[in-house]
């Protein structure tokens, strides 16, 4: 609720946060250069088991401009790929995550609503890399036999 009621403040906070992040990425690039392939830029979860935490319109209004500015700087000034962490049912906002310039989404919580790995690959596989997750971490992994886990992982690898 506060996020929606105080959007100007949210933009001010994110603007400053991204200013600091870019300064830090400048230092990191100078220190490690292309010895790093991928950088983790944001750990904000945008999903629960059943839904995303905001609409695509809200994501585009509040987060996308700031993430895009940071990711554009990284892509224009380094060789790095950028990954975004978000658990949950994020299918409705995945187009915004892609538009913000993220190269990779991690993890892929296939137990969350509409996060079917085949569907994700078919619809977005040429636009973003799905890294990590991708296996059933709530039923198969904790409760499956070693054989069931092995079969499940191999099946997911075929996607």
Where are these regions (language model features)?
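Active-site loop segments of alpha/beta catalytic cores
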Residues: 1-159
């Amino acid at each position: 609720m506060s996020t929606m009621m105080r959007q100007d403040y949210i933009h001010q906070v994110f603007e400053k946060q991204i200013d600091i992040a870019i300064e830090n990425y400048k230092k990191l690039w100078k220190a490690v250069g292309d010895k790093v392939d991928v950088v983790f830029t944001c750990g904000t979860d945008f999903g629960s088991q059943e839904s995303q935490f905001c609409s695509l319109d809200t994501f585009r209004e509040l987060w996308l401009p700031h993430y895009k500015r940071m990711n554009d700087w990284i892509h224009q000034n380094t060789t790095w790929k950028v990954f975004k962490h978000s658990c949950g049912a994020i299918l409705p906002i995945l187009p915004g995550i892609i538009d913000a310039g993220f190269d990779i989404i991690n993890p892929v919580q296939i137990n969350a609503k509409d996060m079917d790995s085949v569907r994700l690959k078919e619809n977005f596989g040429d636009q973003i890399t799905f890294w990590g997750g991708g296996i059933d971490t709530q039923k198969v992994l904790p409760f499956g036999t070693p054989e069931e886990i092995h079969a499940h992982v191999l099946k997911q690898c075929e996607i």
